[in-house]
């Protein structure tokens, strides 16, 4: 009954906070039920914000084993914010959140399939607003409209506008990614001109910054000096490929940031080698995903 209630909560159209409640109305706390099967490090830094993008391939790719492994990874790594892509089963995501009591979340309501979700620490952030961009015109996004989540960082009253996206792959993917990127740039340009300047766009762009000009979707942002890709720093380092699976080793999971948010290049960017902490890529892929999480700290 409790799990059914959790599923009902996550599907409520108006329940954007998606707070998981027990039948008594209290927040379900199952932190003590976390597994301890892996040796994940704590990457959280008290003096910085730690933000991760993570494509969790067909979540949950391995049912309860995925829930156990991913919840352990999140609570051990303990970043402040994670943007997840490729949530295949929403009810199972609510099950994951029951094991992450330190986090609140928002999840897609208008994706045709494969939702996005953003989780954030309750004690650090307040949710201001949320919306799904281009939900009425999402063809170029393959039915997965980008999800914007505006948060206030309580410590400094800083407003962050996070946009979680999962670009089209395969077939007519490049053309549609280019058009999607133009739409997104026009939207962010308009918002920035209105004074909303602290954007972080993160997710699976399904393109590599190493690709030749014209062969990727990044041009609108690369040609705008108000924004930059921290992930450009590591995209040529094959050991940090966010998609390390042969024969398509590539860097697909990028983070774009407003320069005004991170002045003087005061940030760190890295791909988290989760596969090494789990023993091998094949084990990681079996339990969680074929994409690596990418971490931005500033």
Where are these regions (language model features)?
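Metal-dependent phosphoester-hydrolase catalytic domains
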Residues: 1-41, 90, 141, 150, ...
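Residues that flank catalytic or metal-binding motifs in active/ligand-binding sites
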Residues: 47-52, 113-115, 143-147, 158, ...
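Structural recognition of the beta-strand scaffold that forms the well-ordered cores
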Residues: 50-53, 80-85, 106-108, 116-120, ...
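Solvent-exposed loop/turn segments at secondary-structure junctions
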Residues: 56-61, 87-91, 110-115, 123-126, ...
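Structured beta-strand-rich core segments of catalytic domains in phosphoester-bond hydrolases
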Residues: 87-161, 165-167
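A long, amphipathic alpha-helix that forms part
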Residues: 174-195
């Amino acid at each position: 009954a409790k799990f059914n209630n959790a599923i009902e909560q996550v599907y409520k159209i108006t329940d954007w906070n998606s707070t998981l409640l027990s039948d008594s109305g209290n927040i379900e706390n199952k932190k003590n039920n976390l597994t301890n099967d892996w040796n994940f490090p704590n990457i959280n830094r008290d003096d910085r914000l730690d933000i991760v993008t993570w494509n969790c391939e067909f979540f949950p790719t391995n049912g309860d084993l995925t829930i156990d492994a991913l919840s352990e990874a999140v609570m051990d790594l303990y970043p402040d914010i994670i943007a997840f892509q490729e949530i295949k089963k929403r009810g199972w995501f609510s099950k994951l959140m029951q094991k992450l009591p330190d986090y609140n979340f928002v999840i897609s309501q208008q994706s045709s399939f494969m939702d996005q979700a953003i989780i954030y620490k309750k004690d650090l952030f307040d949710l201001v607003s949320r919306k799904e961009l281009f939900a009425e015109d999402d063809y170029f996004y393959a039915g997965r409209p980008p999800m914007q989540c505006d948060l206030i960082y309580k410590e400094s009253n800083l407003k962050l506008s996070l946009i979680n996206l999962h670009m089209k792959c395969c077939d007519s993917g490049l053309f549609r990614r280019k058009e999607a990127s133009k739409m997104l740039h026009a939207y962010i340009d308009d918002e920035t001109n209105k004074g909303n300047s602290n954007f972080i766009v993160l997710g699976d762009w399904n393109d590599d910054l190493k690709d030749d000009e014209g062969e990727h979707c990044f041009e609108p942002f690369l040609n705008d000096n108000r924004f930059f890709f921290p992930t450009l720093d590591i995209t040529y380092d094959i050991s940090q490929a966010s998609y390390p699976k042969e024969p398509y080793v590539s860097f697909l999971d990028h983070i774009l940031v407003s320069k005004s948010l991170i002045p003087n290049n005061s940030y760190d960017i890295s791909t988290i080698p989760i596969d090494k902490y789990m023993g091998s890529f094949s084990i990681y892929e079996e339990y969680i995903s074929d994409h690596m999480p990418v971490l931005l700290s500033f």
